[in-house]
Amino acid sequence: MPNTLTVDLGHRSYPIVFAADVRNNVRDQVAELTTAGRKVAVFTDEQVASAQVGALEAMFGSSPRLAFAPGESAKSLASFGRAMDFLAAQKVDRRGVVFAFGGGVIGDLAGFIAASWLRGIDFYQVPTTLLAMVDSSVGGKTGINIPAGKNLVGAFHQPRGVFIGTDFLRTLPAREFAAGMAEVIKYGLLGDAALLELLERAPLSFVSPELAGVIRQCCALKAAFVQADERELAPEGGRALLNLGHTFGHAIEQVTGYGVYLHGEAVAIGMCAAARLSAKLGHLGGADVARVDAVVAAHRLPVKLRTPLVLMDLLAAMARDKKVRAGMPRFVVLRKLGEAVTQDDVPAELAAECFREVGAS
């Protein structure tokens, strides 16, 4: 039997359904929508479509679907335009509904498609990666990348529901699973000491008995941040704390063209850089930084860049980050392991030192 967690946003509240196998739950939702005369359109990627042929048929039947090439490159204006043409050809009207079936890239892209088509139609998330399950499928952030930066074009558009089925992780490559663990580690560093200690005792894997509970726990933490500060407008802290490691990580992704590091891998390096920044600001000690490095490495994630990147390129990319305020990058720093704050008056030379310490040249 599935269990449910509600993201409480008043009249825009929605359920997150958890089960090992959510195919019947999704199928029932699709049947309810189509019986009511609402057209369903499905967006996925070619890799998921190949690995989950049976699930696609079981959940969506004959509903039209469009598959994009896998990877971050799909979050593009070209993909967005292709999706618009697809929805037009399928004659999807304002009562139409989009389903995102895939990882974080598909969720971000399909959500933005739904936010934009006819000025906004309903959509549902059916995440198939650990990263999407614990983070990107919840909270309504949607968007695409442009050459100037990651997620610079997008919208806040909450889903009508999220279906999290851990059985989808059976076909997830080990590298993708590890990338998702970066976001799990993030929650432990932000404020869940028990979660951090669990991860330090033994790395989580697909067969870990704690996995389903950890996924639900991460979603509950994410929901709490979203409920308190949905549009990331709090002057300090708030939802922006979820960007721990992302200011450094997004710069790494942009400089490498989104094809070298998975998002979670870049965030992992970014969290290690953020720990070093926190130490330079007088918050963490060397033992704390070593703990961050150790839990990241234990989950088969990079602590440092695999090959050096040009420091000035990274700093330039950071300056274009969407979180910049008054020309200054905004960082999430750790006062201690389990407590974070936002800070936007970080001297550029400190950020540069942190990049060097994780492998920039």
Curated annotation (Swiss-Prot):
SUPFAM superfamilies: Dehydroquinate synthase-like. Its cofactor is Co(2+); Zn(2+); NAD(+). Its EC number is 4.2.3.4. The keyword Signal does not apply. Binds 1 divalent metal cation per subunit. Can use either Co(2+) or Zn(2+). GO terms for cellular component: cytoplasm. NAD(+) binds at residues 104-108, 128-129, 141, 150, 168-171. InterPro entries: Dehydroquinate_synthase, DHQ_synth_AroB, DHQ_synth_fam, DHQS/DOIS_N, DHQS_C. GO terms for biological process: amino acid biosynthetic process; aromatic amino acid family biosynthetic process; chorismate biosynthetic process. The keyword RNA-binding does not apply. It catalyses: 7-phospho-2-dehydro-3-deoxy-D-arabino-heptonate = 3-dehydroquinate + phosphate. CDD domains: DHQS. It is found in: Cytoplasm. GO terms for molecular function: 3-dehydroquinate synthase activity; metal ion binding; nucleotide binding. Pathway: Metabolic intermediate biosynthesis; chorismate biosynthesis; chorismate from D-erythrose 4-phosphate and phosphoenolpyruvate: step 2/7. Zn(2+) binds at residues 183, 246, 263. Belongs to the sugar phosphate cyclases superfamily. Dehydroquinate synthase family. Catalyzes the conversion of 3-deoxy-D-arabino-heptulosonate 7-phosphate (DAHP) to dehydroquinate (DHQ). This is 3-dehydroquinate synthase. The lineage of its organism: Bacteria, Pseudomonadati, Verrucomicrobiota, Opitutia, Opitutales.
